[in-house]
Design a protein with these regions (language model features):
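C-terminal accessory/tail domains of diverse enzymes
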Residues: 1-361
Length: 361
């Protein structure tokens, strides 16, 4: 949650602030060795009686691990370039850069972020976190791209902070969730007794290979792939399924009765340079709630990535209200499949079980 809730749109291993476990599979293994060596060195200096630990020790132990896939130490979620580098005076400023934090749109949202960080520093100063690091694997770019699971993870963080004596209310972070995972629309399928809600989700964009350009080479970012969160409340899993463009969504239970969530990954537009350039755009996305007992669609909705009429917007939104109105105007509670509808068997990915990738045929 702390890596993705407050970040910008460009996330993932090739972003400006990748997580330490997003680039290499053995990174956490090496990081645990570095932590153990730091503890050994601190104990060694304390045992010597001088009680002095060289301040450059942190830089030498971690600088080669807190880097992106190309070895750039500045592109890291935790950048220690200016903490205490022995290479020069500009690197000894005592600064730790948290590069995964994007400036929020309101001062009070920034205030809550700073309060949370200060409380965490105070807590870990008092009781250091020494538990084994979790190997999330592909779950990072699967269920933690969805706002529901990011919110659950933050709830666990806040519960731990409250148990340590730092009281944080979940409502303080509601604006952050609405800003990071904006609501697209909601439809009630009265015949099925359920509600279907769509929200924007996160998507780790890829950096393409080098291409020739005037004056040198360039590497484009493939921003043509987007993701939506599909959240269903009150669903009877033995009778109803949800499909998008004719494919069954692999909905997963959240632990709450009747609540199911999944992500839908799709090609929003077709740029000239992208991964799998022969795959066209999947918009508009047509969602259907299918009654498998009666083989018919009992409700649904339709979502357009851009202007529903196929036009381009002539101007940028003047403020957040206009941007929100455009997003809501692209959502329709009509347009789903009428009449008889047979849902195909659900196909769950071994690597990403919470996500349906429409690029897969």
């Amino acid at each position: 949650a702390l890596s993705y809730l407050f970040s910008g749109l460009f996330i993932g291993p090739t972003s400006q602030a990748p997580r330490v476990d997003e680039a290499r599979n053995d990174q956490l293994y090496e990081l645990e060795i570095a932590f153990a060596e730091l503890r050994r060195q601190v104990a060694l200096h304390e045992g010597a009686g001088d009680g002095y630990t060289p301040p450059w020790l942190i830089d030498r132990a971690l600088r080669n691990l807190l880097a992106d896939v190309t070895g750039n130490t500045h592109r890291s979620e935790f950048c220690i370039d200016k903490l205490y580098s022995p290479d020069g005076a500009t690197g000894r400023l005592g600064l730790l850069e948290l590069r995964a934090f994007e400036m929020p749109p309101h001062a009070r949202m920034s205030l809550v972020q700073q309060l949370l960080l200060r409380a965490m520093v105070a807590r870990f100063w008092r009781t250091p976190y020494t538990a084994r690091l979790t190997r999330w694997g592909t779950a990072l770019h699967d269920r933690f791209m969805l706002g529901t699971f990011v919110q659950m993870d933050l709830e666990d963080v806040l519960a731990e902070m409250r148990s340590a004596g730092f009281v944080f209310e979940s409502a303080w972070f509601a604006p952050h969730f609405e800003f990071r995972f904006p609501r697209v629309g909601e439809v009630e399928a009265e015949a099925a007794g359920l509600s279907l809600q769509l929200r924007a989700a996160l998507e780790p964009w890829h950096v393409m290979g080098e291409e020739g350009a005037a004056g040198g080479t360039v590497r484009y970012v493939d921003s043509s792939v987007e993701r939506l969160e599909v959240r269903v409340l009150g669903m009877n899993e033995t009778r109803h399924v949800v499909t998008v463009n004719g494919r069954t969504i692999p909905l997963q239970p959240t632990g709450r009765a009747g609540e199911y969530v999944a992500g839908v990954r799709y090609r929003a537009w077709a740029p000239p340079s992208s991964l799998h350039p022969t795959i066209g755009a999947h918009a508009p996305l047509t969602f259907d709630v299918v009654d498998t007992w009666m083989d018919r669609s009992v409700g649904g909705c339709q979502y357009h990535v851009s202007h529903p009429g196929g036009r381009n917007y002539q101007t940028f939104p003047v403020n957040a209200y206009e941007a929100e109105s455009r997003r809501l105007a692209r959502f329709f509670t009509i347009g789903h499949t009428p009449g008889r509808s047979v849902a195909p068997p659900v196909e769950r990915s071994l690597e990403f079980p919470f996500t349906l990738d429409l690029r897969q045929i």
